[in-house]
Regions:
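Conserved mixed alpha/beta catalytic, RNA-binding, or beta-rich assembly cores of soluble enzyme
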Residues: 2-23
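C-terminal active-site/capping subdomain that shapes the small-molecule cofactor and substrate pocket
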Residues: 16-113
C-alpha cells in the first residue's frame, strides 16, 4: 500500500495485458498504490492478420494497449507516468526497490529522495 507500482512487459499480446491488468484492478492494487509507472511495453501491439505468429486471435477484436490503459488504469486517477524508458531498452534506467521517490509527471522523470 502507498507504494509506486511499476509495470512493463515485452512481446505480450494486448488481450493478455488486458487480462493481467484487470486482475490487478480486481485485487485493488491500483486503488491501494500511491502512483503508477508504466514502461514502454515493447512489441505489445497486435500482429498483422497475415503474421504467421498469430494464434487465431482476430486483431480487430481486441483493444489497443492505449485503450486498455485508458479503461483499466486511468480511471483510478493516480499519478501515472506513461512510457517510462526502463528495463528492456537502452539506455536502461534502474528503479531501486524500496527507495523513496517522487514522480515528476511534467518532465516525465523519477526523482530519488
Amino acid at each position: 500500500k502507498d507504494a509506486i507500482l511499476f509495470l512493463e512487459d515485452v512481446g505480450e499480446r494486448p488481450y493478455r495485458l488486458d487480462r493481467n491488468l484487470t486482475a490487478l484492478a480486481l485485487a485493488e492494487k491500483f486503488r491501494d498504490c500511491a502512483g503508477i509507472i508504466l514502461g514502454t511495453f515493447t512489441d505489445c501491439e497486435e500482429p498483422p492478420h497475415d503474421d504467421p505468429s498469430d494464434s487465431g486471435v482476430i486483431a480487430d477484436s481486441t483493444l489497443t494497449l492505449q485503450q486498455i490503459i485508458e479503461e483499466v488504469i486511468l480511471p483510478y486517477k493516480k499519478p501515472t507516468l506513461l512510457n517510462y524508458r526502463a528495463g528492456h531498452m537502452y539506455p536502461q534506467s534502474t528503479l531501486p526497490m524500496g527507495a523513496e521517490i517522487s514522480l515528476d509527471l511534467v518532465q516525465k522523470r523519477i526523482l530519488l529522495l
